[in-house]
Amino acid sequence: MSEALKSKIADVLNEPGCATNSTKTDVLRKRGCAERLTPGAAAGGCAFDGAMTALQPIVDVAHLVHAPAACWSNGWDNRSSASSGSELYRKGFTTDLSELDIVMGHGEKKLYRALRPVIEAESPAAVFVYATCVTALIGDDLGAVCGAATAKWGAPCVPVGVPGFAGSKNLGNKLGGEALLDRVVGALEPETVTPCDVNIIGDYGLSGELWQVKPLLDKLGIRILGSIAGDARYKQVAMAHRAKVTMLVCSQALINVARKMQERYGIPYFEGSFYGISDTSQSLRRICELLVDQGAPKDLLNRCEVLVAREEAKAWAALKPFRPRVAGRRVLLYTGGHKSWSVASALQELGMEVVGTSMRKVTANDRDRVIEIMGDDKHMCENMAPREMYQECCARRADVLLSGGRSQFVALKALVPSVDVNQEKHEPYAGYMGMVDLVRAIDRSVNNPMWADLRAPAPWDASLTGSVVSVPSGPAR
C-alpha cells in the first residue's frame, strides 16, 4: 500500500464529523473502522466495491477498472441507480490484466492504451480509473497515467486509488468521495449562480427516487446544482462548490465530503431523509431555513409551508384507502443507515407496528433517532445471519419483512411476505407519493390471499373428516 493511500485512509478514519468515530478511544480510532482485508480475497463488501457504489451513478462518466476482469464483473452495477440521460455508466470497461501483464510489468502501458478507445468511442465527460488489489500490489501509478492521458486526449481522467484490501465497503465510499474532492469538485464554474442552489450528497437515485423529490424543489425555485451521485453529471460534481446548502442523505457513507466542503467552501450541511411524509416535510423546511440564512428570499419559508400543506393533504388522501388494510400490521425492518429510522417513522405514521429495525451501517445519531421514534432500544437488531433473521421473524410474529431482495427466501421460509426496500429494489419510495407507493406495495404483499393457502396445512396433513377428504357416496363397487 502506498504512503499516499495510507495517509488518506488515516485522514478518513479520523473523521471529526462521524458520530461513531468521535466516541472511540484513540487506540480504537487508530485501528480503523474495519479489519484490513486480505489482497485477492476481498470480494464483496470491499473498499473497491464501496468506491464503485459511490461513484458509478455519475451517468456521463466512463468507469474503467484497471484489473483482471473478475474485479469488474463481480460487483458491476449492483445498485439500480437510474439515469434521465446518458446510459454510459451502465457500460463496463476493464483493462483485463492477465498474469503475463502482471509478471512483465505491462500494467501501466495497458492502461494507457485502454484509455484511448474509451475516450474516442464514447466521448465521456470524464474517465474514472479504479485501482484494485492487484494493481495496487504491483505498484501501477494511476495518477501519472491519468495525467498523461488527460494531456494527450483532453478528457479528464480521474484516478480512484481504492484497492479492495484497503478496508471495508464503507471506507471505500469515503475514499471515493475523497477522489471527487481532490480531483473533481471545483474543476468547473457554473454559468449562473442563484441564492437557491443546493447539493444532494449520499443519494444514489435508486430506481429514480430523486425524480420524486426534484419536482418539489422545482416548485420552490430550488435548483440541485451538485449531486453526489444519483443521476449526476460530471459537471454537476465539478460545480458543487458553488452551492449554498448541502443536504446529506447518508452520513455513514459520505459525511467526509459534506464536512470538507463546509470547511473549504463555507457550505452548511444537515442530514435529512426523503422517506416518509413527515421526514420529507422536515427536510424541505430545513433546506429552506438554511437557504434563507445564506441569503435566499425570506418568502421561501412561507412558500415551503404552503407546498408542504398541499402535498401532505394529497398524500394522506391517497393513503386513506390503504390505512385500514395495513394498520396494526407488525413489520420487521432489516435495512441500514438512515432508513433504519426514517422508514420506521414513516410506517408508524400509518399505524403499523415496527417490531424491530436493524442497526447496520448506522451512526450514533441514527441510534438516537431510533430510540426517539421507537421509545426504547429494545427494538434494535444488530447484523443478523439468515438463521437469526428467520428466528426474529417467528419470535416477533412479524406480518411482513422489509429488507433487501436477498432476504426474500428467509421470509418465504418463515411464511411471511417481504417487500424490497434496499438498493436492489425496482420501485422508488421517496417523497410524498413514494410513501403512497410503499404502502401500496405492503398492502399488495400482506393482503395477498395466497398467504392463507401457504400457511394452511397440506391436504394430506389435514384431518380425514369434513370437506377436506370425505368418503365417496353411492353404492359400493
UniProtKB/Swiss-Prot annotation:
Gene Ontology MF, one: nitrogenase activity
Transmembrane annotation, as ranges: none
Gene3D superfamilies registered for this protein in UniProt: Nitrogenase MoFe cofactor biosynthesis protein NifE, C-terminal, Nitrogenase molybdenum iron protein domain
Matching InterPro entries: Nase/OxRdtase_comp1, Nase_comp1_CS, NifE, NifE-like
SUPFAM superfamilies per UniProt: Helical backbone' metal receptor (SSF53807)
Function recorded in the entry: This protein may play a role in the biosynthesis of the prosthetic group of nitrogenase (FeMo cofactor).
Protein name as annotated: Nitrogenase iron-molybdenum cofactor biosynthesis protein NifE
Gene: nifE
